[in-house]
Amino acid sequence: MPRPITRRGLLASVIHAAGVAMLAAGSGCTAKGSLQALREEVQALQGARVVVPPLPGFRDLRGVIHTHSYLSSDSDGRPEEFLTGAQQAKLDYLVITDHFDPRIFIEGLNGQYGDLTVIHGAEFPLGCTRKRGLARRCASILGFGFGPSIVPTFSPDAYSKPELIAQIKRHGGLVFLGHARGVSDPQYFGMVHGMEVFNIADTMREQYLSFPEFMVDLFVTQQEYHEELLLSVIERPNWLLARWDRLTRAGHRVVGIGGNDAHQNLSVLGVLVDPYGLVYRILNTHVLVDVQGSESPAPPSTQVLLAALRQGRCYLAFSLLCDASGFQFYAADPRSGRPVAMMGAVWEHVPCPQLVVRLPRVGAIEIIKNGVPEFRTVGRELEYTPSGPGVYRVEAFLKLQRRWRSWIISNPIYLLPGC
């Protein structure tokens, strides 16, 4: 049975046709020398990285949320392919969110695979904006981590969207809004644990007009600079961050995550544009799991990982620029320096804490309060005295080709008026 034509399929066709036309016309392309210079600059960024001593009692896990397999209608990815991709990207966990199909309960991977924790879930449609064509935006519900009480006979169509969200949560699952720019009814933001504040597939779709040039460069360089060309995907998600800040400023505890939305299905001119191993390295959601009282080097349990995500003890990082493992943002007692609140936590006690930031390499550090940049400096560490109660988060940037590029986006710490 032929698959339906999707926006992603249409995009691939447009790119393919444009790429062929440009090649036939002998169009110019980015010189290998420029891409080599870019590679050397990125290598210099990565070479300056240092190991940040971990916070006692916590472990930083690097992972990917929102990936698809052959159990989705728009991907042919096999388990061995995304497990290999996870190994290439040095992931600690992988959340699979196939478009809902009862087979995910039978055939879908779930559990421990060596050092990799795999958590199965599903993606459910949430409707689209009224626009048509490539400008149309469609949101989704990402549900994962639900227990065995949701059985293969579970039918999402039997519920309204609010009831579906409640059902997933009732069975122990986490619920996030995917493709959050497509959410047409703001009530959903108050029903879920969090939202994607970056989605790779959406960003690639928004940049589709520049893709023919991308594909020609990829083709003529024989894929030698695939990583360097995909650095163009890394952009600060201004609209989504502004939406997220409005929600948290209004008192909603909304956890921000990254959505890789990996399909490994975009092949143009015989070249696979989005292999799992590469898409898993562009963006990672790091989770700080609580391992206090445990000396075991074994991977923390799925429940411990999900608990940290639920609390918002996590941050996003564009790892293709530089590995951000070891990043720290916490509130500390100004007298002892002891951490008193981690990302996602609420603090309302006296005295008001200091905010501490540590990076694994020098970068621009920006303190954002209630959605507004309040302080910026360049360095590897920062101890900052907040100006008063508010919702504080951190963004970090790395300079590449004379421009500051988004690197790290933290979840907020909520300082209440009581402090």
Which sequence ranges carry the predicted segments?
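C-terminal functional module detector
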Residues: A31-D60, S72, P79, A250-G256, ...
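C-terminal motif of bacterial Sec signal peptides marking the signal peptidase cleavage site
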Residues: S27-G28
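Residue-level preference for long, well-ordered alpha-helices that form the structural scaffold
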Residues: D157, L229, V233-R236, A298-S301
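Generic recognition of flexible, low-complexity loop/linker segments
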Residues: L83, V183-S184, R243-D245, M342-G344, ...
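N-terminal secretory signal peptides and thylakoid transit peptides that target proteins
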Residues: M1-A21
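Short glycine/proline- and acidic residue-enriched helix-loop micro-motifs
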Residues: Q223-L229
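A metal-dependent hydrolase metal-coordination microenvironment
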Residues: G33-T221, I234-R243, A250, V254, ...
